[in-house]
Amino acid sequence: MTMTETAAAVKAIAGTDKFRFLHTMIRVRDLDASLQFYTDLLGMKLLRKRDYPSGKFTLAFVGYGDESSNTVIELTHNWSQAEPYNLGSAFGHLALGVPDVYETCERLAAAGVKIPRPAGPMAHGGSVIAFIEDPDGYRIELVQSP
């Protein structure tokens, strides 16, 4: 069976037309700092938060709208994690559409956010982008949205 035939069979079997992207999870060392970053600086809402004492971790979900119709970010805080996480080279970034990348970067820089790639056009295309970092060093691409 070819890759195309396999993909078609899986779609027919699984009913992928009803699938939906729910969330992406990132591990954070300081949950309070991460919540402050994502809610106060990026304007997301804390949708839910729950401690799991037997597992010694907390899950907090943040996003721009209700989980029933929006993709959100799951922040996982492992209580015993003292050292920074190794972000490795496989994970790329999260991306946010913003109305004005330049203004957003000015506001975030004034709040002390790291901006490893300042606002400007992409080198090989017309989109205006920037990259910022959250408190754990995860990169977030800001993309100029219409």
Where are these regions (language model features)?
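Vicinal oxygen chelate
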Residues: M1-D17, L47-R50, T58-F61, L96, ...
